[in-house]
Amino acid sequence: MGYRSEVAFAIAPPLVDKFLAVMAASEKVRDLIKYHEKYQEGIQFDKYEKGDVFVYLGSIKWYEEFEEVKKIKEFFDEHEEDDDNIRFVRIGEDLDDQELMGYYQEDTIYIPSPGIQF
């Protein structure tokens, strides 16, 4: 079974070509993020604005030793300073296991705070 995470990321139009190059160079990345209609997860284009990319992966084994995960993480690490054009959010099974990077669409892609509803 293994430890699972929920991952979402978005890339603004200025960096999309660079991410598409990562996809083109790695079949494993393409397989990981291909869109699955049934589960409403994977890659989507033009979700927030024309030319952007959004990826949602629910209940995934997001291990940094996996080649496809490493390639995606490298892309975000390389563009960390261009943080207005990227957004990466990951939450693990443990609620304190979270990663957040970038500000693109930060008002729509975020981890809600746990709270009591009544």
Q: Which residue ranges define each predicted feature?
A:
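Short, extreme N-terminal segment that most often corresponds to the first beta-strand
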Residues: 1-27
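Charged interaction segments
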Residues: 22-118
